[in-house]
UniProtKB/Swiss-Prot annotation:
GO cellular component: cytosol
Binding annotation for GTP: 257-261, 278, 301-303, 323, 358, 363
Cofactor, how bound (note): Binds 2 divalent metal cations per subunit. Magnesium or manganese. Binds 1 zinc ion per subunit.
Superkingdom of the source species: Bacteria
Annotated region (DHBP synthase), positions in chain: 1-206
UniProt protein name: Riboflavin biosynthesis protein RibBA
Stretches for region GTP cyclohydrolase II: 207-424
Cofactor: Mg(2+); Mn(2+); Zn(2+)
Organism, as annotated: Chlamydia muridarum (strain MoPn / Nigg)
Length: 424
């Protein structure tokens, strides 16, 4: 098993390699393209390195650029309607307007990349179309969009390079796509550092400051007085908050609940899920302890698919799909939530260690991976109703949640860790 520390060390080596003018390999997520790209700083390119890139990849040489670079260099989108599954932001392709022949040779493409990496280049420095494919990186990098374009741009920034990286997809001798073991063998043969997009995401959540504190105030609730601290994501502008009970600074073993926004459950009292009940019980528990934190993550409706799509999933569930099948039917991941914002908020609150209130193993292990020191897990009762029993069982059986309740035909008095409700 590759540890978080090993992943961070690999990213640190990759950053050094980029600064030194060496290739690195970035492997994509299995749920996306599931391939590896050779990446090099545009300003470090040479005809020899370009020839190596062309010899071991598809030969489609991409160059990451910022939105501002695309504007200044007059690089419009390749098409008006982007139908690519991953919304890869191709601009028109380019060649250097001088100093080349046909534009396709290693030397010619090197010249084009050198101009893309030159801050003095202007629109007239290029002709269109050409043999190098600029891709516009999303602001926020891999935290915003976990693609090779953003990975390339993040590596350039972290290495102190001009914001233009070149990359192409690795292929085997028969031009089939390299997969993980083939990529690792190739990297070992040539001495290249390999990282994953997720390694880079973890690195950025660990070392970059990606949330900012906005405001704080006292807030009286039915469970007593809390303090609310509002944070804003600098990636997408979403505002999240932490409800804090007691003086938690530098405290050990602080009860913490990381709660994803669920308007239907938290506000409307929907019985399709147990979200509202979990939030209510967490507030009550923390109030009784006199110490604790609830981090409330907004923008995570429907396990990260959005409010409108969650309601679509509800309609599919009424047709017989379970909560996992409904997401997949809508072409969404089973669980698209990420917890980097929560980790940064908890670090800003200066907790030393926490006891996490959760049944969700993904949340538990991801927060650990992001540097949160979790001592143990607090188990609160599961609220079961006729409306949410199948939902809860699906979370247990298909998503691996740590829920402990008996089969449907057992009598109610046999439930030990479950509370039943007549709701709905």
């Amino acid at each position: 098993m590759v540890t978080c520390e090993a992943g961070i060390a690999s990213v640190q080596q990759a950053i050094k390699d980029i600064a030194d003018g060496n290739f690195v390999i970035v492997i994509d997520r299995e749920s996306r393209e599931n391939e590896g790209d050779l990446i090099l700083a545009g300003e470090k390119v040479s005809a020899e390195k370009m020839a190596f890139l062309l010899s071991h990849t598809t030969g489609i040489v991409c160059a990451s650029v910022t939105r501002e670079q695309a504007r200044v260099l007059d690089l419009p989108a390749m098409v008006q309607e982007n139908q690519c599954a991953f919304k890869t932001a191709f601009t028109v392709s380019v060649d250097a307007s001088s100093g080349i022949t046909t534009g396709v040779s290693a030397a010619d493409r090197t010249r084009t990349v050198q101009l893309l990496s030159d801050p003095t280049s202007i629109s007239q420095s290029f002709v269109r179309p050409g043999h190098v494919f600029p891709l516009v990186s999303q602001p926020g990098g891999v935290v915003k969009r976990p693609g090779h374009t953003e990975a390339s741009m993040d590596l350039m920034r972290l290495a102190g390079m001009y914001p233009c990286g070149i990359f192409a997809e690795l292929v085997n001798a028969d031009h089939s796509m390299m997969r993980q073991q083939q990529i690792l063998d190739f990297a070992e043969q040539h001495g290249f550092t390999v990282i994953t997009v997720d390694d880079l995401i973890t690195y950025r959540w660990t070392f970059d400051s990606l949330v900012e504190h906005v405001s704080s105030a006292r807030i009286p609730t039915k469970y007593g007085e809390f303090f609310i601290h509002v944070y804003k994501s600098i990636i997408d502008g979403t505002e999240h908050f932490a409800l804090v009970k007691g003086d938690i600074r530098e405290q050990e073993s602080v009860p913490v609940r990381v709660h994803s926004e669920c308007l239907t459950g938290d506000v409307l009292g929907s019985c399709r899920c147990d979200c509202g009940a979990q939030l209510d019980m967490a507030m009550r528990y923390i109030a009784e302890q006199g110490l604790g934190v609830i981090v409330y993550l907004r923008g995570q409706e429907g396990r990260g698919i959005g409010f409108g799509h969650k309601i679509q999933a509800y309609a599919l569930q009424d047709l017989g799909y379970d909560t996992v099948e409904a997401n997949l039917q809508l072409s969404f991941p089973i669980d698209a939530r990420e917890y980097g914002v929560a980790a940064q908020i908890l670090k800003d609150l200066r907790l030393t260690s926490v006891r996490l209130i959760t049944h969700n193993p993904k949340k538990f292990f991801e927060l650990q991976r992001l540097g949160i020191h979790i001592l143990d897990r607090i188990v609160l009762p599961v609220i079961v109703s006729s409306e949410n029993e199948r939902y809860l069982r699906t979370k247990k059986d298909r998503m691996g949640h740590w829920l402990n309740f008996p089969v449907l035909n057992e009598s109610e008095d046999e439930y030990e860790t479950v509370e039943r409700t007549s709701c709905c």
